[in-house]
């Protein structure tokens, strides 16, 4: 990564959880000149369309790679290469995010974007050369890249781990002095369980950032009183978190906007809203990305009038704290018979049923009403429930036109790299994007 920045190349980390078809799309989208792949993921690569690309493999001993592949060690040089002559707004990394149309869009982040993100992280968490970042998040995630760069620029180190293994992680914290970690559910809970089982107080851990439920954060507070859980809000498109604060400072909020960014809330006509009013969260500043790769129409809309329009809803209170409330209604709206139905409202009603563990609601074509509500649900272990029973249950709790017309029970729901239910992937799988 550092070598690419030095040379002026753009890095495109690919999510190894993608399907082979999705990987092929990403490769086609960016048309790379160089491909570096771990041996275990070669099976995800397309069979065609790689001609002309230099191909290097990780995990292969020198001399063992078969043409056209070479070991990544072939890229190593024993001489110094002068840095490329770049301006700060040239691209450094493309991270593909979910798209409304079901195809991932590549968010282009510049050198300036990532330097700004690194500086604000260093300042907020007071990073020093003594800090050690525990690299358990995958490096196709903007938070993982941000934590790595911030720690490095502060003079600290990152311990890159190939997978999240709680007992091993406890050992690394105790033996290596790990002080910083980014997590998503259920990682923190599993780490605390392992620490309790191993009799560890995780004494060196001081910064935990990510998403989790208040109960788990309370466990952290009790088990590791020296560690602070930080709440934050951000996107790939904002190079990471543009608001953050210790969770206990304002529980439930996403923290305060950082000094390098301006955050506002606007209505559907792009007019600023007063304090406390809910609208779309918009951002401007040096952390806002350069745009989606080869998506001019999307860029014109998303970056209109000098602001990045996040598609997320929220409000800013009188003390400047940002409160995230969900995706923009324009992004998530079902219209059976012209009526407005918001998925979150239906999902809340569904999850009141004691037999349900997870649920996601989408709109699907309907001959009579134009669009209908469809629910995909995961049952709790040992429970049974029919579609008819669930529809009747929900219909008793919200307006009848909002209840699902179709219910499908599934074993699991797809999730994003951030651990959230991937609604767009559900839509794509159902053939309705």
Regions found by a protein language model. Give the residues of each.
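Conserved AMP-binding A3 loop
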Residues: 92-116
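Conserved pre-ATP/AMP-binding loop-to-beta segment of ANL
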Residues: 74-96, 103, 126-132
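Gly/Ser/Thr-rich phosphate-binding loop
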Residues: 153, 175-183, 192-251, 262, ...
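ATP-dependent adenylate-forming carboxylate-activation enzymes
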Residues: 9-27, 39-42, 136, 156-175, ...
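ANL superfamily adenylate-forming
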Residues: 42-88, 195
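A short helix-loop-beta submotif of the ANL/AMP-binding
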Residues: 1-12, 16-20, 29-34, 131-132, ...
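Conserved AMP-binding/adenylation subdomain of ANL enzymes
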Residues: 115-132, 140-180, 194
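AMP-binding/adenylate-forming catalytic core of the ANL superfamily
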Residues: 18-21, 35, 262, 269, ...
